[in-house]
Amino acid sequence: MAVYNYDVVVLGSGPAGEGAAMNAAKAGRKVAMVDSRRQVGGNCTHLGTIPSKALRHSVRQIMQFNTNPMFRAIGEPRWFSFPDVLKSAEKVISKQVASRTGYYARNRVDVFFGTGSFADEQTVEVVCANGVVEKLVAKHIIIATGSRPYRPADIDFSHPRIYDSDTILSLGHTPRKLIVYGAGVIGCEYASIFSGLGVLVELVDNRGQLLSFLDSEISQALSYHFSNNNITVRHNEEYDRVEGVDNGVILHLKSGKKIKADALLWCNGRTGNTDKLGMENIGVKVNSRGQIEVDENYRTCVPNIYGAGDVIGWPSLASAAHDQGRSAAGSIVDNGSWRFVNDVPTGIYTIPEISSIGKNEQELTQAKVPYEVGKAFFKGMARAQIAGEPQGMLKILFHRETLEVLGVHCFGYQASEIVHIGQAIMSQPGELNTLKYFVNTTFNYPTMAEAYRVAAYDGLNRLF
């Protein structure tokens, strides 16, 4: 058994692990990365964010071709199978792996491919694919192993028609009808993707409102859009059992209803990847979902062991995970890069997409904050008309008296890009965070960004 000594060992090469390893390496520390795959990138690159967004992009292109009358001069609407569309994602994955492999090589981070587990508080044993065991001894260890779909024990995921958000990428056919159980972010995104391929979707939600953490007007807009695009949303429903049959799946609900479809996609929660880490050897406890608890410095109850990314729970976003990993390493190397990551924009890649940052109307009303609303509807925006993307809106919430921007909510074309302008203004100190910025700034025309000017004027016109 070979023994290697490091300043920092990072478990997991997803966004959190990458952020941690790069920050520690650039601070001059000797760093090792351990990943259970034979390629870097983590679930984000191989099973989550990258393939699903590449898949979504291809589906949007198909939808544009099939719905734009101009293309009828070229030919009739085309039908594409799910496996055909998935090929585009495979190309992106290989490019991402190559880029990230280069990052580690340039920064002299040693990468070990194998299953890593704690022998003690300063030692990680890595069992490589060929059976060889490597021992890594480190002053500090960062757990960034990510998460996987939560699988209830009473559902047979070995059935060929029952999938989770990882295995759905191996779907070898295009179902005529699909049940998506769980209407969280992942469930809504996949419902949009399959709807765009012409699949009838039954989206089962155990709550009374889609994505209830969003501003209610944005949530309602998404629900309305779904109802117009082959997606039936069933609220306040819980599964009783899932029955796999020869030609499909039957979902039995506790309400007594039954739904039959060609396949079922389970999207109801995620579990931290901690079960194989040997946590009992270091005294770090995990909750019922396999997640570890950390303090504001991303330190666990063991002083030299840290956690970042999906394995610690909220907000379970790739963007936040990278910053959490970077901040965890910042706590170790003390190079001024630490910050507690809490000002995270939400990006939801439905079709159309959704993004938001800051407070929503419900929260401001409950807190008795005197706010006003400014709106810009995309159907009136020149750039949206040119792009053939009239659905959606930008909504700015601001303080009636100080004009401080309190929240930005967007639904529609390029929403995940548009939100960052509002984010930048909201991060400014004192009087620099003001709605007046948007009316005193010249925006390129035509752009989606000028929706801020339109929304700001709309909001100011509501004041008296």
UniProtKB/Swiss-Prot annotation:
Q: Which reaction does it catalyse?
A: NAD(+) + NADPH = NADH + NADP(+)
Localization per Swiss-Prot or TrEMBL: Cytoplasm
Q: Which UniProt keywords apply?
A: Cytoplasm, FAD, Flavoprotein, NAD, NADP, Oxidoreductase
Top-level taxon in the UniProt lineage: Bacteria
Which top EC class is given? oxidoreductase
Identify its protein family: Belongs to the class-I pyridine nucleotide-disulfide oxidoreductase family.
Q: What does this protein do?
A: Conversion of NADPH, generated by peripheral catabolic pathways, to NADH, which can enter the respiratory chain for energy generation.
Its protein name is: Soluble pyridine nucleotide transhydrogenase
